[in-house]
Amino acid sequence: MINVAIIGFGRMGRFYLAEFQKSDRYRVSYICDVDADCRQLAHKQAPEAKVVDDTEEIYKDASVDVVTLCALAGSRKEQIRRALEAGKHVIAEKPIADTIENEWEMVRLAEGCDRFTTVNMYLLNSWYHNEIRRFIDSGEIGELAIIRICHMTPGLAPGEGHETEGPCFHDCGMHYVNLARWYARSEYRTWHAQGMRMWSYKDPWWIQCHGTFQNGIVYDITQGFVYGQMSKDQTHNSYVDLIGTKGICHMTHNFKTAHVELRGVNETRIEERPFGGKNIDRLITEMADSIETGQRRKDMPTFRDSAVASEMAWKMLQDSYHTELPAIGDLQTLEAIRERRRNMTDGYGLLPRNNKNV
């Protein structure tokens, strides 16, 4: 079995543990967290693992094959460096470091060593996006011309969490920046962003960006955690439209079921399957396959994918500051939203109560 250590036992660390425990290919050897409450929970949920508050024992243990990095972004550069120096394979949350410069340094480090590295750009591992791309590749919609992506939820409120990853267009939006690039199979050429400072918060918490790729495909990406935080019954708006010269592909979901419409020149297919969540099961399967065969799985997201998406999300976010950036609402409403979320037990993107290392 592949021995794995989890560093950071907040929300994502717990997701990884659940998937590792379901797999017959992994053994969780260590869980590390600096927070005593997180370590206590780790003891309870993973009695088979050694729970520690320092990473050095993990790196010195030659039996550990893989480290999974789920602590805050500011710690990832040093943890990636230590892991690769110790000969470990690495699964990291995004972004892979706290600054663009540090991210590209980690890309160069990873690409210059013989260990397998990957990052949880989970949309690339979803059944629905892979099904859509196969349909596009078959020629059924003609040439792909327009990519439209929208993801708005009542998710993290400003100041609530993930501040080390920046405003939500970087923290969450970089997934969609990466997804558009993956569909286009091209690099970004132009971008223009319009933001909104909801509740008069200092940073835009909603952004729409549109532009072109180098191959001529156009895109628009809309992302924000602004979608009805105080609604009695909360909902969200998430979809992808791929528009070709002859047909279209459309996907939407309710976080439980994904609905896909494929409308080509010879075939119409409508499919519904379970959404799949963060798709961590597929990510760790790809890592296990790579380790056991000695050949990197081509579908496994790379550090370079993450760095490009992070850099472009920052550029788009910064572009929004150079246009008119209106502010609507007030900080009192924002504080009411935060208070509501502190007391919610069922909602969008709620953080664990002990959220220091989420």
Question: Where do the model's predicted regions map?
Answer:
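Contiguous beta-strand/loop segments that form the cofactor/metal-binding neighborhood of enzyme cores
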Residues: 177-259, 274, 282-295, 314-315, ...
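Glycine- and charged-residue-rich phosphate/anionic-cofactor binding loop of Rossmann-like
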Residues: 27-29, 268-274, 290-308
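N-terminal Rossmann-like dinucleotide-binding module
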Residues: 1-46
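Active-site loop of classical SDR/Rossmann-like NAD(P)-dependent oxidoreductases
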Residues: 15, 34-37, 272-285, 301
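Beta-loop-alpha module in the N-terminal Rossmann-like domain of NAD(P)-dependent dehydrogenases
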Residues: 16, 46-109
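Mid-domain beta-loop-alpha active-site segment that forms a flexible
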Residues: 120-128, 151, 155-192, 199-206, ...
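A contiguous active-site-proximal alpha/beta segment in oxidoreductase catalytic domains
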Residues: 74, 97-157
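Hydrophobic residues in well-ordered beta-strands that form the structural core
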Residues: 53, 92, 117-119, 148, ...
